[in-house]
Design a protein with these regions (language model features):
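Catalytic cores of alpha/beta
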Residues: 128-132, 306, 366-380
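Radical SAM [4Fe-4S] cluster-binding motif and immediate context
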Residues: 192-362, 377
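Glycine-rich beta-alpha loop elements in corrinoid/cobalamin-binding modules
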Residues: 54-58, 63-185, 391, 397
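Short, Lys/Arg-enriched N-terminal segments with co-localized hydrophobic residues
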Residues: 11-24
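N-terminal [4Fe-4S]-dependent radical SAM core
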Residues: 25, 35, 163, 169-219
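Glycine- and acidic-residue-enriched helix-capping/strand-helix junction motifs
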Residues: 37-48
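C-terminal accessory regions of radical SAM enzymes
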Residues: 27-37, 167-170, 175-176, 355, ...
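Short, solvent-exposed turn/loop segments enriched in Gly/Ser/Thr/Pro and often Arg
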Residues: 70, 121, 266-273, 298-299, ...
Length: 467
């Protein structure tokens, strides 16, 4: 299973924002309830915590609250949302949360509340439905600067057209402002306001499900590669890094304040820069000896030296986007890697003693039994300790959507997407239903490594082996 995703929010930086001038405001950020693995083992909504921290840096009289629907049962969630009183409510949404996100404005009694919607679920869908649901502003791209400017604009009745990275209605016409530039220096972003999150609950859930307390953080943003199923509209293709000292500062907070035993880096590609990884490992060995951590990698960006150094510095897990053991499928997905590179990476991972994980995609149009057999053979030969299985989902805005949208079922509505565990393609696209393929690969993994599967780590779509 992929592990993953402080008070020090007054970090001094060079960004200058306009000063706020008017009276007290209450701002509530919401992560809606959703479906899928994160409802089973939720991760802190760090994106919302970054937004809160960006506001709190410049103003201490704001009342800010973060609500995570994943931590609440249905009745409690409805009670909390329907009784909210706030000047601004900001909602983040993935595609699987979007139907719930669209419902939130109708549940709020205060008709003067301004509603803001952002996140990966909203970027590439027509926005008319968002406005119809009650949202005043739609945000695109990184939001740390945008939320500060939007709050000032709402409070001081300034023109929204001067805030980059948003869209809104003016006289029934949509206005979309210029894109928000990426934040070049990630050290300029304050540490996420975890003090507004129920970190004790997140950590305790991970301890219960995984057997040890774990939490998540990021040390970079962006990915330069062009996988056809991936959307880079939020963080872009340019990779930007936090400094080693900034990373260590946040790690120490997690280890010391929240008593975690492991930190997982949710970076899209932790291993993109070898020198940075080696320097980071040197810093870890000096500042945090003996601490455990994990990360995501890409098979052609690692080598034996890097992995050995990572192991020496406390890395216990690395997950790779393998997707398939079939070169045909890899090429169709635009992965830009070779099967032999996958095998070599796992050979090194196993030699140095890091738990290696595979993200695998099932249900690719054109997938045959031979492709599935190749994936099973890759699993057998590579001996991953963890597998995470996903159906290929052609989300709007991705290249794979443009290539395969004519194969999507007529009943699929991405505004009401709840098929995270069901293929969105028509059944006639496949020789065998993807659900059966997924079971076949899972059963193969369990049977091949019988006796080594750790039931605590068989969560959602993830299955892992005992050490």
């Amino acid at each position: 299973m992929k592990f993953g995703r402080s008070l020090g929010i007054l970090l001094r930086v060079s960004i200058k924002y306009p000063k706020f001038r008017l009276e007290f405001m209450k701002i509530v950020f919401i992560q809606p309830k959703g479906r899928g693995k994160f409802s089973i083992c939720p991760e802190p909504p760090l994106g919302l915590a970054y937004l809160a921290a960006s506001l709190l840096r410049y103003r201490t009289d704001l009342e800010i609250e973060i609500i995570d629907g994943f931590l609440l049962d249905n009745d409690k969630y409805m009670e909390v949302i329907s009784n909210l009183e706030a000047d601004i409510i900001g909602v983040t949404s993935t595609m699987s949360q979007l139907d719930e996100a669209l419902r939130i404005p109708s549940l709020i009694k205060n008709k003067n509340t301004k509603f803001i919607l952002g996140g990966p679920g909203v970027t590439n869908l027509p926005s008319s439905k968002f406005y119809e649901s009650g949202y005043s502003v739609i945000c695109y791209g990184e939001g740390e600067k945008t939320i500060v400017e939007l709050t000032e604009a709402f409070e001081n009745k300034l023109a929204l057209k001067d805030v980059n990275g948003i869209s809104f209605l003016l006289n029934s016409n949509e206005i979309r402002t210029p894109p928000r530039e990426l934040i070049e220096n990630l050290n300029d972003i304050p540490l996420p306001a975890r003090e507004l999150l129920d970190m004790k609950k997140y950590v305790s859930i991970w301890k219960e499900k995984m057997g040890f307390p774990c939490s998540q953080m990021v040390s970079s943003r962006g990915c330069p590669f062009s996988c056809r199923f991936c959307d880079k509209s939020i963080f872009g293709k340019k990779v930007r890094f936090m400094s080693p000292s900034r990373i260590i500062e946040e790690m120490k907070l997690l280890y010391n304040t929240y008593n975690v035993e492991m930190i997982y880096f949710e970076d899209e590609l932790f291993t993109i820069n070898k020198k940075r990884v080696l320097d980071f490992c040197d810093t870890i060995e000096k500042e945090l000896p003996g601490k455990k951590w994990g990360a995501n990698g890409r098979v052609e960006t690692v080598d034996f030296e890097m992995l050995s150094k990572m192991k020496q510095a406390g890395c216990v897990e690395i997950n790779f986007g393998v997707e398939s053991g079939s070169q045909k499928i890899l090429d169709f997905l635009g992965k830009g890697i070779m099967v032999e590179q996958i095998k070599k990476a796992f050979k090194w991972v196993n030699e140095v003693g890091i738990n290696g994980g595979m993200y695998l995609i099932i249900g690719v149009p054109g997938e045959t039994q031979m492709d599935i057999d190749m994936t099973k053979e890759l699993i057998r030969e590579s001996e991953p300790k963890i597998i995470n299985l996903f159906y290929l989902t052609p989300f709007p805005g991705t290249k794979i959507f443009e290539l395969t949208k004519h194969l999507i079922r007529n009943d699929v509505d991405f505004y009401n997407y709840n098929d995270e565990f069901e293929s969105v393609y028509r059944k006639d696209v496949f020789e065998v239903e993807p659900k059966q393929r997924l079971k076949e690969v899972t059963d193969f993994f369990l049977e091949t490594f019988k006796g080594r599967v750790d039931p605590r780590l068989s969560i959602g779509d993830g299955t892992a082996l005992k050490d």
